[in-house]
């Protein structure tokens, strides 16, 4: 989960290339959910391109954001940056993982959770 106004999100993006390599090696897909407001949509594509964000991207609607709040039991809004882990069945395994800047600790957490 990220947004165009989130400076910590962009700090984490700087660690993305190593994360992409790990995910590819382990056959794991990346899905980015942008929780920007509609007025920010013009910043969305340039931010994806400028930060070399490989993977799938969704600019979330208000309805999706509400569903995320319910799923994560955070009625006042979800915090970002945030990394969720789902298994191959689409089940939420980790509602909040370590960050890409944590490197190997994140990779170990992912592999352990998907066993």
Predicted feature descriptions by range:
Residues 11-51, 64-70:
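Structural microenvironment flanking redox-active thiols in thiol-disulfide oxidoreductases
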């Amino acid at each position: 989960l990220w947004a165009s106004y989130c400076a910590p999100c962009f700090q984490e993006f700087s660690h993305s290339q190593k994360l992409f390599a790990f995910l590819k090696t382990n056959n794991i897909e990346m899905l980015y959910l942008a929780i920007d407001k509609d007025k920010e949509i013009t910043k969305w594509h340039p931010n994806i391109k400028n930060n070399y964000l490989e993977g799938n991207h969704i600019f979330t609607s208000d309805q999706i954001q509400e569903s995320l709040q319910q799923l994560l039991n955070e009625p006042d809004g979800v915090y970002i940056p945030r990394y969720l882990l789902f298994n191959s069945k689409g089940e939420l395994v980790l509602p909040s993982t370590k960050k890409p800047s944590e490197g190997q600790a994140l990779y170990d957490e992912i592999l352990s959770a998907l066993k």
